[in-house]
């Protein structure tokens, strides 16, 4: 099929590669403008832009698609490029810009979105992280016919993906990205064959995956250990769970932790023990064992290495 692709990060790049491998005609790709990245804050193209240029595809990078918005010239130019591309359908994956009504109406077969959850659960910006944080054991990707709502369009196809007990957001991201690429190729094949029925999203079971906030990554030891361990996994690698350890001026990042089936009489935040097997912290319910940490400005270290250079004073931990 002749299509336009809109996406920005690695999740979307995987889908673009799958569409190209399936032989779809993609004359135009939309992606976010280049952003500063790295230590030197050098302007860096998105993964999708890099893949598109490598494939010889024209790239558009409007700052907005709203003709009546802050960047009307950008939107008008993108509109002209889309009309010139004349796609049958538009595929959207983690693009990062709101698609106004004119965009949704332009392709004859509309706009299909690859969403990283089993809708209507986890509509919104951070479905991967919120699924882990909530303790879900299963998630997936939904191919959705886009409308003007927030992930409210009709569902066309689902691929289910299990969430392992130790999966981090990075690991689940990669699994869902691969599933998304497979799902959109399957959906377009069904669409071409006239066999892609749409189902309205049910009214029950709607949840929203709020955007990640760096402040939420600070672990509060008054909360249950099981929740804290899930948050460590959910916020790995971004924004990274943090905790203030006594004796250190800056909070440390916690890359791995586990909830122990144990109780503690000490106040939440108390260091119960520290050794090569882990740093055990009293919480509001249960014990959290820290397994991999990183000091500010340092490297990630397994706990047996970390504890050699840190001795816990006898007072509770504090959240960031």
Swiss-Prot record:
Give the Gene Ontology MF terms in alphabetical order. Answer: methionyl-tRNA formyltransferase activity
Tagged with keyword Protein biosynthesis: yes
Q: Name one Pfam family in it.
A: Formyl_trans_N
Give the record's keywords alphabetically: Protein biosynthesis, Transferase
InterPro entries, per this entry?
A: Fmt, Formyl_trans_C, Formyl_trans_C_sf, Formyl_transf_N, Formyl_transf_N_sf, Formyl_transferase-like_C_sf, GART_AS, Met-tRNA-FMT_C
* Gene Ontology cellular component annotations, sorted alphabetically: cytosol
Against Gene3D superfamilies, the record matches this protein to: Formyl transferase, C-terminal domain, Formyl transferase, N-terminal domain
Residues annotated as binding (6S)-5,6,7,8-tetrahydrofolate = 117-120
Q: What class of enzyme is it?
A: transferase
> Might you give the EC number(s) for this enzyme?
2.1.2.9
Q: Per its UniProt entry, which superkingdom is the organism in?
A: Bacteria
Reaction(s) catalysed by this chain, per the record, are: L-methionyl-tRNA(fMet) + (6R)-10-formyltetrahydrofolate = N-formyl-L-methionyl-tRNA(fMet) + (6S)-5,6,7,8-tetrahydrofolate + H(+)
Function description: Attaches a formyl group to the free amino group of methionyl-tRNA(fMet). The formyl group appears to play a dual role in the initiator identity of N-formylmethionyl-tRNA by promoting its recognition by IF2 and preventing the misappropriation of this tRNA by the elongation apparatus.
PANTHER family, A to Z: METHIONYL-TRNA FORMYLTRANSFERASE, METHIONYL-TRNA FORMYLTRANSFERASE, MITOCHONDRIAL
Family according to the record: Belongs to the Fmt family.
Spell out the protein name for this chain.
Methionyl-tRNA formyltransferase
């Amino acid at each position: 099929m002749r299509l336009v692709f809109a996406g920005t990060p690695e999740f979307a790049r995987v889908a673009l590669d799958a569409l190209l491998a399936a032989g779809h005609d993609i004359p135009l790709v939309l992606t976010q403008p280049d952003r500063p990245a790295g230590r030197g804050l050098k302007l860096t193209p998105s993964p999708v832009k890099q893949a598109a240029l490598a494939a010889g595809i024209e790239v558009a990078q409007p700052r907005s698609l709203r003709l009546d918005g802050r960047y009307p010239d950008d939107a008008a130019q993108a509109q002209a490029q889309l009309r010139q591309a004349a796609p049958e359908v538009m595929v959207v994956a983690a693009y990062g810009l709101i698609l106004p009504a004119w965009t949704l109406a332009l392709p004859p077969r509309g706009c299909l979105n690859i969403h990283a959850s089993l809708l209507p659960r986890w509509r919104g910006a951070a479905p991967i992280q919120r699924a882990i944080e909530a303790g879900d054991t299963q998630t997936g990707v939904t191919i959705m016919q886009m409308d003007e709502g927030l992930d409210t369009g009709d569902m066309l196809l689902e691929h289910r993906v299990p969430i392992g007990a130790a999966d981090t957001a990075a690991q689940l991201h990669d699994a869902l990205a691969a599933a998304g690429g497979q799902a959109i190729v399957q959906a377009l094949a069904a669409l071409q064959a006239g066999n892609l029925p749409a189902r309205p999203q049910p009214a029950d079971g709607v949840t929203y995956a709020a955007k990640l906030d760096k402040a939420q990554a600070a672990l509060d030891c008054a909360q249950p250990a099981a929740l804290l361990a899930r948050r460590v996994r959910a916020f790995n690698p971004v924004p990274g769970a943090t905790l203030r350890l006594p004796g250190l001026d800056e909070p440390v990042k916690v890359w791995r932790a586990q909830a122990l089936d144990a109780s503690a009489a000490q106040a939440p935040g108390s260091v119960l023990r520290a050794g090569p097997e882990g740093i055990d912290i009293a919480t509001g319910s249960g014990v959290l064992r820290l397994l991999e940490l990183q000091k500010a400005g340092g490297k990630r270290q397994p706990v047996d290495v970390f504890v050699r250079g840190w001795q816990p004073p006898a007072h509770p931990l504090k959240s960031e």
